[in-house]
Amino acid sequence: MTPSVAQNTKYVNLFIGTSGDNGQVAPGAAAPFGMVCVCPDNDPRSHAGYDYAVTKVSGISVNRLSGVGCSGGGGNLRIRPVAPSQELHIKKSREKATPGYYSTAFTNGIKTELTATNAMAVERYKFPRSLSAALWIDFASTFEDVATCHYKRISETCIEGYVQAKNVCGHGRYKLYFSLNTSHPFQLEEQKETTACLTFGKKVRSVEVRIGLSALSSELASWECARWEKMDFEDVKSRTADQWEKQLSAIDVKGGKKDDRVIFYTSLYRTYLSPADVSSPDGAYLGTDGKVYISEDFRYYSNWSLWDTFRTKFPWLVLTEPAKMRDMATSLIHLYATGKKDWSTGFESTPTVRTEHAVILLLDAYRKGITNLDFRKGYAGMKQEMERLPMRSPDQKMESAYDLWAMAKIAEIIGEKADSEQYRQRSVSLFEETWKKEFMNVTPAFEVMKNNGLYQGTRWQYRWAAPQYIDKMIEWVGQDSLRSQLTYFFDHHLYNQGNEPDIHVPYLFNRLGAPEKTQQIVRSLMTEPMIHKYGGNSEFKTPYLGKAFKNAPEGYSPEMDEDDGTMSAWYVFGAMGFYPLLVGDEYYDLTSPLFDRVLLRLTNGNVLTIQTEGRKKKDAPIKSIHFNGKKIADYRISHNELIKGGELIYNYK
């Protein structure tokens, strides 16, 4: 199998954000929207298992979540090519990672290469003559507590079983069945309840391990391995590399610095890592009620971090992957039908985080053209969720007002007029009561992290958390006063790029008559050093001065989690010059693109060209914007207009 020439994947630097608490991502081998991300786990580890700054390795595991909090999730079926009593260290000069592939050498002479399909990890180990080929496997390894595990030798080259572990932050459980197959027969030694050693004899110098995964059965996990048995390691690697090249070749950019292109395509790559397609070949999937269902008309997805990703990543997938997004949205509707919690349930198919604000995501997909969604199927579950929305703190009330607003729109779509009006009134009254009491009159307490029970933020940051009601904020405060307050917010470094609650706020200047402020702030956030006063949970004792996005292992500002593609999608939107300020609305707010020219090939066959003209300075303000010859006066463009393709031209002063 001949690999395609790397065009845009050559710009991807998988080590961005892998060092310390600066992103919490990993450079593992993965396919787009796959169950597998196979990678070394360091000791001590990050949330994603891997830490660029640490050379000591506890082993190589098959899965992890990208950039999430708590202790992460995954870390299953960890393999060590040396005994647990011996230390294993990465030789950093030999480390390499490209989309779908990871390789390194260890200081003891062992070399490893990793690649993956959607549901199979492929691990190749090469041993020096001084060492006998052997693999120590921990069937109970996990980044959270393991509940149960079981393994059984099936043949001289195969072990099958399952592992059940707690999900992120200790909520709920997932269960993975596996089929582990080796290229050479093994002897099973040092066998214990959850661990074993596989030895291969003195003559074997190279061992390949293929681990198929399934949420349903070991038989399906075995089928995953059998599916690719005629393809060798290089074939699998090339196939996955081609998948990534196709995924990233939908967008071409010109202009900007090389670091800008590297950060852009690395960010683009990370928007397509999840959620995971967990359906069996015949469409079977595990419902969150523990029952197995069969779908004939969609693929079932799992692995959610919606509190973060509804804001940017899923609007990005609505635009660039509408067919897959239809399946993802349908999966969420089925989640409502089989039993949805805000966090993980007890019957998950993969490691997963949380699913708040799914109704906003579903509304966004519908209003942007993905209308073949059966809201009726999940409507009862949605209604139940509306009755248990959290209301303990001001931030929860603001976010619940957003959910109720979206639910009102969904009820209207399916003809439930009484429900729609009830949810609309609840949303408006909840927002008005909360905003006027907690957020309208600015006090010094607005700068205090977690004041009055706020989650990972300040009152300043949550003040803008209901963008659907920006007109009401203007009505109560006045546009000039609100703009002055927003300017103060940025001038005094009260904005936090390192967490999600206020990442849409730079675009509010468009709605307040100062679009040049949006342009200046967004570009600065993407490219310039800035003062960061806040981390994820507290105010820094000494503010951090530096870039929020860097082409380096410390790729994000301190304590800034990449959050499963959220921050990556934020960067991609900003670099292209438009952004979904109000998720659930059909409009994008416009800003100055980072690049001189962007070509976006849409899945409907249309091509959108974004072009800058007359920009002599990188921070020059926009003079006018035209779409297919028509002037855009309000710095907004609808999704349905954008996907027609054509030319979006930015002219500069």
Label each region the model flagged.
Residues M1-T2:
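Bacterial N-terminal signal peptides
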Residues W405, K409-E412, T443:
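Conserved, charged catalytic cores of large soluble enzymes
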Residues T434-T443, V448-K450:
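Long, well-ordered, tryptophan-enriched scaffold segments
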Residues E399-D403:
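Hydrophobic, small-residue-rich alpha-helical packing segments that form membrane-like cores
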Residues V5-F314, V318-I360, R367-P390, D395-M398, ...:
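Accessory carbohydrate-recognition regions in carbohydrate-active enzymes
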